[in-house]
Regions:
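Short, surface-exposed beta-strand/loop "edge" segments at domain boundaries and coil↔beta transitions
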Residues: 30, 87-89, 107-114, 141-155
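Generic recognition of long tandem-repeat/solenoid scaffolds
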Residues: 22-25, 105, 136-140
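Acidic, Ser/Thr- and proline-rich intrinsically disordered linker/docking segments
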Residues: 118-171
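Anionic N-terminal interaction surfaces
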Residues: 39-96
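Short, solvent-exposed coil/turn linker segments
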Residues: 14, 32, 38, 50, ...
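Phosphoinositide-binding peripheral membrane targeting modules
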Residues: 72, 81-134
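Cys/His-rich short segments
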Residues: 1-45
């Protein structure tokens, strides 16, 4: 899930890992992780020998999208809210966007309209298959945390990178 962008065809959301292999289901390029922790393409060129180098390339791609005003997360979400640090209360569906101006979360019932500028936080709490519910992006402040479970698959890693890069670009 961290390697969401194919190093060969540059498409996003088609990378799937299983065991020691990761494969792009768009172009078919497949890599295997060897006993030394290096990636090896099963056919053709190995673009990145090490996972951190691939991840750094993804970060640079996101940064370029932001600079060129092409970055946008736009997805429907299930919304969980934590206000008392005791439990997360699932409150319904909504829509989450993230761009150069930060996050905007709106519930479909109109009860929630939260925005968070890029300067609110350097990092983003995001996790994969969180408590077996699903991938999660968490935004909020000291008063309330919003746990957003995106309907779109494979957006969490890119969103985390984008939040970090937006913070750096806007400070």
């Amino acid at each position: 899930r961290i390697l969401y962008k194919c190093a060969n065809c540059h498409e996003e959301g088609f990378m799937k890992g299983e065991g020691i292999t990761i494969k792009c289901h768009n172009c078919g390029k497949e890599y295997e992780l060897d006993e030394l922790g290096q990636l090896c393409a099963l056919r053709g060129e190995t673009e990145f020998l090490h996972i951190p180098h691939w991840y750094a390339w993804e970060r640079e791609c996101v940064r370029e999208e932001i600079i060129n005003d092409n970055y946008l997360l736009d997805t429907d979400v299930e919304i969980g809210v934590m206000v008392d640090y005791k439990a997360i209360y699932m409150v319904g569906k909504g829509h989450l966007t993230h761009d150069k101006d930060g996050f905007v979360l709106k519930s479909y019932d109109g009860e929630l309209n939260y925005s968070q500028p890029p300067q609110a936080s350097y990092g983003l709490y995001a996790d994969y298959y969180w408590y077996e519910i699903g991938d999660v992006i968490c935004i909020g402040d000291k008063n309330c945390l919003y746990y957003c479970f995106p309907e779109k698959e494979g957006v969490v890693a890119k969103t985390r990178l984008a939040a970090e890069e937006l913070f750096k670009l806007t400070k």
